[in-house]
A protein has these predicted regions:
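Phosphate- and other anionic-substrate recognition elements at nucleic-acid/protein interfaces
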Residues: 2-16, 20-145
Length: 145
């Protein structure tokens, strides 16, 4: 599960920004070129079922999971949990699951929401989905089309 893999065929990708309480979800367009925020869901026991349903409904070919590192690149307490979840997703769903450094994604998500005129009071509820979209867009831009 590295982020150096090359992607040779187009398809829709999903991104997950996994926190301790919530999971932000983003989806790409069907060609895997642009990312958009999709939803924020609680991190709960049936998380796998919810993700599997979305993968099937939107014909997702791969998932990008953000790895929460500190600004200096050090691992956070959540990194191991996120890697385990990514590994389990790959086993259960039978599709590619890649990890990607999510540093600065929340800051970029805040900037995007501000530029789009999203009221401050609404931003907290949407932040994780926007951060997932940032992670996914970075991933898509870094890989060959």
């Amino acid at each position: 599960m590295g982020n150096q893999d090359k992607m040779s065929t187009p398809g829709r990708w999903m991104s997950l920004d996994i926190g301790t309480k919530r999971v932000g979800i983003a989806l790409s367009d069907p060609l895997g070129i642009t990312a958009r925020p999709f939803s924020v869901i609680p991190r709960r026991p049936r998380l796998f079922d919810h993700i599997q349903a979305l993968v099937q409904e939107y014909d997702v070919r791969g998932i990008v999971v953000g790895i929460p590192r500190r600004t200096g690149g050090e691992e956070t307490e959540l990194c191991d949990q996120v890697r385990q979840l990514a590994s389990e997703l790959e086993k259960r769903l039978g599709i590619k699951v890649r990890t990607y450094d999510e540093r600065y994604s929340t800051k970029e998500a805040e900037r995007m929401m501000s530029e789009r005129g999203i009221p401050v009071r609404e931003r907290r509820a949407r932040r994780d989905a926007f951060a997932a979209a940032v992670i996914l867009q970075w991933f898509l831009e870094e890989h060959d089309r």
